[in-house]
Structure formats: C-alpha cells, structure tokens
C-alpha cells in the first residue's frame, strides 16, 4: 500500500472511525473529529470509513461551511455540512447498522466532484424535525380543536397565531396537510391549506385551552375549514422552508447508495445535479419505526437535475415525504436579451434554480419556442459566464437569427437513461415519478399508491422551467393502486402535460410512450390523460374497478394533440 507521508493514511486503508474519536455515545458531538478525518482524506484514494453499530450525533457548531445554491430548494445561503466529501476518489462509507442523528440546521452529506463514491448501511434522522404534527380533536366549518404534544413539538401562540421553533427563531404556521387516520396517507379530495395573509390563506384566531390543546376559530365570514376534515386525522404542520437535503451530490461520477434509510430531512432526501451514473439500491425514505411520525422528508424523496449517464433506482421504498418520490429534469433558462445572432443573456427564472450552472464551453444548447415548446436551433457554447445568480451571458458558435426574448434554452449535454424497478411509492404528498429525460427510460415492476398522477411527464417553459422532452419511455409490469384521488395533483394515473400552448403542424414536444402489461386498480374511469405527444401505445393492461374512493369525473383516455394512439388487448 502506498502511504501519504503527510497524513499517514495508506491508500486502500479501512479506517474504523472510532479510532479517530468518532464515537456512538449519547449526545457526544462527532462533527469536529469527522471534519478533521475528511480533511486528511482529501487527495487520497481507495479509502473505506467504517461506522460500527450505534448512534452517532452531529451538531452544526464545528461543521464545514459552504455557500451553496441547491437546486429546487428555498434558499441560497451558507450551509453547515457534516460529511463534506470534496474531490474524493473511490471512497466508501460503510455502516454496520449505524444510525446518524443530526441536530439543528445541518446538511448531512455534501459530495462535490467525487468519483466512485459508495455509501451503505446507514440510517439518518434529525433529533428535532422541522415540521410538527397535531391530531384533530373536533372540527366544524368554523372551529377546530387540535392536540399537539408540547414536548415533542413545542409551540407558542403570539397575537392569536400559532408559532413553532426554527433554530433561535419562531416561525408561524404557514400551511398544513391532513392525513387520513386509517390509511396514514393524504385525505381523499384534500389540498394544502395555507395560513396567514402573506400566503393568501386562512387567518384563524388561535387560543390554548390547556397545555397541548389548541382551538382555532375562523372569524372571517368567507373562510371555512375543509369539509373533508374529521376528528382523529393527523395534520402535518409546515412552518419551515425546504433548506437542507440529506444527500446533495454535485458534479460527481459513479455514486452508489445501498441499504440507506432516511427518516427525515429538512429538504429532499437525495438530490443530484450535473452528476453521471447514479445507483440507488434499497435506498429508503420511510417512517422511523422508533418515532412514528406521519411524515418523512420535507420535500421530494429523490431529485435529479441535469444528470447524465444512467440513473438506476432499484428495490427502493419512498413513503410519506412531502413531495414527489422521483423528479428527473433539466432546466430552461429564459432569453432575456438577444445581443446579436450569436450572443444572448438568459435568466434563471424560478427562484429555486438561481445560481445553477447552465453549461460549459463546447457543450451544445437547444433554443426553444416557449409557446410550442419545440426547438428550432442547436449550437455549441463558445463562451459562457454568470453575471450573477440570475443572469448568464452566452456566446454561441453557430448563429441564429430567430432567437427572441421569451424563448428558452436548455443544455443537451445532460440526458440520462433511467431505470426504475421493483420499488414502492406510497402515501406521500403530490405525485409519483416526474420523468422528463430524452434518454431511454424504463419503469417496471413497481407499486404506486400515491394521491396524484403516478407518472407525470411534463416539461415546462413558463412556470417551473423544468426541461426534458422525452423520446422513449416504457412503463410495464407495474401496479397502479387507486392513484389520483386528489384533484390538485393530477388528472389521471398516467399524465402527459407539457406546458405547450399550441401545436405546430405534425411536430409534438414529447416522443414515444409505451404502457404495457400493467394492472390498474381504479375507483373511477380515469387511466390516461395526455397532451402534445407523438405516440402512445396502451397494450395488454388490466383495469380493475374498485370502490376505494368516490369517483372523480373524467374519461378513461383523455387525449389532445396526440398524433398516434394505439390501444390493444386490454381488459
């Protein structure tokens, strides 16, 4: 073994972290010894860090600090990081049933420019989640009584409004989601309920009847609680922005997470950007059996922005997170100013995309009409520079006279193939798989039990600015179990709805979609809702009627601007 004379760590070494003072002892802060160890490993290769069984605590006081613009999160700010994995090669972090417990505002894992990174055998949770819970004691249209455990979820009532702790501050309740007592899933026909005039929401007067019992009264004539609310249901009380994902992976190659469980994160459980070849195997976002909260991650289970190579999600369980299980997309930047036929300034429009890199010299861009969502020019980047986190200046190698303000660009260098198989997606807020990748996509042998569209294929150049016209998606041998029971989150179990405002001749934004050999358990007629796609094959599927929920109006196949639709051998 080669040995680094500066650190004394041999290439290929296995390090039991307890030998470095990282110990599974009650409340002991392991952040500083972990930081020192990771700093020693910079420039090293083929290292394994071994975490023996036990609970390891991490606090933000001695953590590494970085300014991060994390895609699809709510703030661009200095983040404290526990596992700062920077430019590592062939690093393995191996847990032997190790539990990592994080405290306060701390980002557990940040990997930047790593190659061949493997993480396994860990569970992750926070000592105090960033959301709270309540149980409905009684409810009518104007008054609701809530039971809140003040030890588990401390609260204050200030000027008649409910507040919860956020670090050293107290944040007001700004929305909640009601969960069915029996199913531990969102209530049928519910929606997010917002609070406060700043959110255009309800403005109840809150009063504590006794410790742990709070009454909310709506005094404005026009305001009502939802008719679907009932005693015994639990409320997820949201009073924190999505700030810290559990795993944030940026500009890496060959990332493999196996046998990892995330019980909570104050953002997404896993997000990767500009990363090639990712495998998530038996990666779980699930309820902690020792602390049975009704929610897990505060946002998506997994999210992939401008990734490449192959993305594999296998044998995973994603449940009870507060947004979609999987979202795969690129980013559209809107043309702000055309500075000639070969130069332009573009804007990152959505607040959660600020600061994201749109490309490098030599990579190819596509220019798209935001009305039809169709591309009309491709060119390599001659030069590119960020003017600030909002605006980017770009010079193209090939000129184009058609470019105009309001149109958008996307980077063609990041188009992953995707395989999602043998997974369970259930009981979360919102939808299932959001798939906008021009690579080859295979979705098979999965179980979907989600309140919105189980599979959503979009592409949007006018609101979220998430790019990715599909070319070839196959959805086969899956079970769709009574999905799309919340109207706000989808029109049908499988939905294709790019933001194109009009068609253009025989061209369509999306390419081919094959839906075959699946089983649909449906409480109404709706199965497929599609717009602006070239070809759909719906074959050899079984559709079974259930009485799980009251039917929602809609056709079995609701299609517009679909060039070719083939239906055969379904029953």
Where are these regions (language model features)?
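Acidic Gly/Asp/Thr-rich repetitive segments characteristic of extracellular carbohydrate-active
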Residues: 17-50
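Ser/Thr/Gly-rich low-complexity blocks that favor extended beta-strand/coil architectures
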Residues: 102, 126-127, 151-207, 354-388
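Small/polar beta-strand repeat architecture
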Residues: 186-242, 378, 383-420, 425-427
């Amino acid at each position: 073994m080669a040995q680094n004379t500066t650190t004394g760590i041999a290439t290929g070494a296995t390090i039991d972290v307890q030998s470095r003072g990282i110990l599974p002892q009650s409340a002991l802060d392991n952040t500083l010894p972990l930081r020192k160890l990771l700093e020693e490993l910079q420039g090293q290769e083929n290292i394994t860090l071994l975490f023996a069984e036990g609970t390891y605590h991490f606090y933000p006081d001695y953590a590494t600090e970085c300014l991060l613009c994390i895609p699809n999160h709510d703030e661009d700010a200095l983040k404290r990081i526990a596992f700062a994995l920077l430019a590592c090669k062939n690093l393995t972090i191996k847990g032997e049933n190790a539990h990592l417990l994080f405290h306060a505002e701390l980002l557990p894992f940040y990997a930047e420019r790593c190659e061949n990174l493997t993480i396994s055998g860990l569970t992750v949770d926070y000592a105090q989640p960033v959301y709270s819970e309540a149980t409905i004691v009684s409810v009518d249209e104007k008054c609701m009584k809530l039971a809140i455990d003040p030890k588990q979820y401390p609260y204050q009532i200030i000027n008649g409004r409910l507040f919860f702790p956020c670090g050293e501050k107290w944040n007001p309740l700004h929305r909640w989601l009601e969960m069915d007592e029996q199913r531990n899933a969102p209530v049928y026909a519910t929606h997010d309920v917002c609070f406060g005039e700043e959110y255009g929401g309800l403005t109840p007067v809150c009063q504590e009847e006794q410790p742990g019992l709070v009454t909310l009264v709506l005094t404005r004539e026009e305001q009502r609680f939802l008719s679907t609310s009932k005693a015994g249901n639990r409320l997820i009380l949201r009073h924190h922005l999505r700030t810290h994902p559990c795993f944030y992976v940026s500009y890496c190659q060959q990332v493999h997470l196996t046998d990892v469980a995330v019980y909570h994160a104050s953002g997404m459980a896993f997000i990767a950007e500009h990363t090639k070849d990712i495998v998530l195997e038996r990666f779980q976002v699930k309820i902690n059996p020792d602390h049975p909260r009704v929610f897990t991650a505060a946002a998506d289970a997994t999210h992939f922005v401008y990734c490449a190579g192959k993305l594999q999600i296998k044998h995973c369980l994603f449940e009870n997170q507060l947004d979609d299980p999987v979202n795969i997309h690129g980013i559209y930047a809107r043309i702000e100013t055309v500075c000639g036929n070969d130069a332009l300034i573009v804007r990152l429009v959505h607040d959660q995309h600020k600061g994201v890199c749109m490309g490098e010299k030599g990579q190819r861009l596509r220019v798209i009409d935001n009305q039809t969502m169709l591309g009309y020019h491709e060119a390599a980047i001659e030069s590119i520079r960020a003017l600030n986190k909002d605006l980017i200046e770009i010079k193209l190698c090939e000129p184009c006279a058609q470019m105009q303000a309001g149109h958008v660009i996307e980077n063609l260098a990041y188009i992953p193939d995707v395989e999602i198989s043998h997974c369970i997606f259930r009981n979360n807020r919102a939808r299932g798989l959001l798939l906008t990748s021009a690579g080859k996509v295979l979705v098979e042998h999965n179980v979907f039990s989600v309140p919105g569209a189980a599979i959503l294929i979009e592409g949007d150049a006018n609101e979220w600015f998430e790019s990715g016209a599909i070319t070839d998606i196959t959805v086969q041998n899956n079970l769709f179990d009574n999905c799309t029971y919340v109207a706000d989150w989808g029109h049908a179990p499988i939905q294709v709805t790019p933001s194109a405002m009009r068609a253009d001749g025989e061209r369509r934004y999306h390419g081919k979609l094959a839906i075959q050999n699946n089983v649909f358990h449906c409480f109404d007629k709706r199965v497929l809702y599609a717009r602006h796609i070239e070809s759909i094959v719906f074959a050899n599927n079984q559709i079974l009627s259930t009485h799980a929920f009251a039917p929602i109006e809609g056709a079995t196949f609701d299609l517009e601007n679909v060039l070719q639709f083939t239906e055969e051998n379904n029953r």
